[in-house]
A protein has these predicted regions:
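Gly/Pro/Ser/Thr-rich low-complexity, intrinsically disordered segments predominantly at protein N-termini
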Residues: 1-201
């Protein structure tokens, strides 16, 4: 099935979406990703294949800063592990997602087999961050944050440098919106973690 797109040589618009539920299973998608490592792809729970364009330089810089700050905290805290945007997770609803930044509790990570750790981990991270770029429409990102929470994330942040807002999602609560904050606290979910948002604006 992966040979439909491999080798791939075509031009697609940013965040190109095509419904493949009738021709591509989750396992087919996993193989497609392995066969095309140069592409960043996701698969929705309803079978939509999403081809995502590379980030611009400014967005890449912001992503690196997010990973640096969360990674520094995680190295000291040692209660979990951090992943960058190249990591694909298989969520309980069947979606394949690659959050910009994510964190998984150490006990959940250690409970995976070696094969699961080496492949696409079958879990939803405990904490995720998505960073909006100028080309991103906001509603699909908001839907993605709700999906993370519905699949087991304890907290999810949507950071919008365009509007200088941070949306905080938690289970069984409406999203909290912070307007132009200087810092955002991890509170109980990530005790001691405080993101310096000024580095992202």
């Amino acid at each position: 099935m992966a040979t439909i797109f491999s080798p791939i040589d075509m031009h697609v618009p940013p965040n190109f979406i095509v419904d493949v539920h009738s021709v591509l299973t989750g396992e087919d998608f996993d193989q497609l990703v392995r066969d095309n490592p140069e592409l960043r792809m996701e698969l929705s729970a309803t079978g939509e294949l999403i081809l995502m364009s590379p980030t611009g330089s400014k967005t890449g810089l912001r992503n690196a800063e997010l990973n640096r700050q969360l990674g520094n905290w995680a190295k000291t805290n040692r209660s979990g592990v951090v992943f960058d945007s190249s990591t694909l997770f298989v969520l309980p609803n069947g979606a394949r997602r690659s959050p910009d930044v994510s964190w998984v509790k150490l006990e959940r990570w250690n409970a995976l087999s070696v094969e699961e750790q080496e492949g696409f981990a079958p879990l939803c991270p405990d904490f995720v961050i998505e960073l909006r770029s100028r080309s991103d429409n906001l509603p699909p990102l908001e839907d993605k944050m709700l999906e993370y929470i519905a699949n087991g994330a304890q907290m999810a942040w949507l950071i919008d440098p365009v509007r200088k807002r941070v949306y905080i999602y938690r289970p069984n609560r409406t999203a909290e919106i912070l307007e132009d904050p200087q810092t955002v606290s991890g509170d109980l979910e990530l005790a001691g973690f405080k993101l310096d948002v000024r580095e992202l604006w």
